[in-house]
Amino acid sequence: MSEGIFTLDAEVRTDLGKGASRRLRHEDKVPAVLYGLGKEAVSLTLSHNKVFQAQEFEAFYSHVLTLNVDGKKVEAVIKDMQRHPFKPRVTHLDFLRVDAKQALQTNVPLHFVNEDKAESIKTHGGHAEHHMVDVEISCLPADLPEFIEVDVTNVELGQTLHLSDIALPEGVTSVELAKGEDHDLAVVTVKTAKGPSVESEEDDAEGEEAAAE
């Protein structure tokens, strides 16, 4: 993975509105907005090809990016990305400015690991049901992780891991947990595999009896 995906060239745009955004997309460009840190929001234009290549990497969504805005470097993270409903196109981006000395809030992906080693799954036939695929965290830009691992090794059948069970990197806190115990959301549950229904078992038995006759 090239570090180049974390640097994007952008231009300030003054031609705003739906019509202007539509024209930009026809020119293979992506409209965007940059905001945050108490500064005025700025409308931007970026190369669609560069954005599309970068967004194929998971780390692009949970990494501090460098925007070269008309020659000036700005540190930011992706806050929102809109896509075309059926075409492989990015239609709009939201960037949030970051300051090295100020904590930021953003979502990072969860990586569920060791499901193949969990006895509840490997031996007892359970399956892991993921209740979320990412988690909102708060941290300084330097502490921003690309992802957070959720270790399923010791999760038993019927057991659920919650946010409070997840080991977060040093300097990283859960935004939801900071709101109180009521926000200790479920992350993953190992559920018992569903067996055949009683009706299907009875049908099988009747079929076997009929075959025997």
From Swiss-Prot:
Keywords: Ribonucleoprotein, Ribosomal protein, RNA-binding, rRNA-binding
GO CC terms of this entry: cytosolic large ribosomal subunit
PANTHER family, A to Z: RIBOSOMAL PROTEIN L25/GLN-TRNA SYNTHETASE, ANTI-CODON-BINDING DOMAIN-CONTAINING PROTEIN, RIBOSOMAL PROTEIN L25_GLN-TRNA SYNTHETASE, ANTI-CODON-BINDING DOMAIN-CONTAINING PROTEIN
Family: Belongs to the bacterial ribosomal protein bL25 family. CTC subfamily.
GO biological process, any: translation
Organism of this sequence: Pseudoalteromonas atlantica (strain T6c / ATCC BAA-1087)
Segments of skewed composition (Acidic residues): 199-213
InterPro entries: Rbsml_bL25/Gln-tRNA_synth_N, Ribosomal_bL25/Gln-tRNA_synth, Ribosomal_bL25_b-dom, Ribosomal_bL25_C, Ribosomal_bL25_long, Ribosomal_bL25_short, Ribosomal_L25_dom, Ribosomal_uL5_bac-type
Segments passing through the bilayer: none
MF term (GO), any: 5S rRNA binding
Protein name per the record: Large ribosomal subunit protein bL25
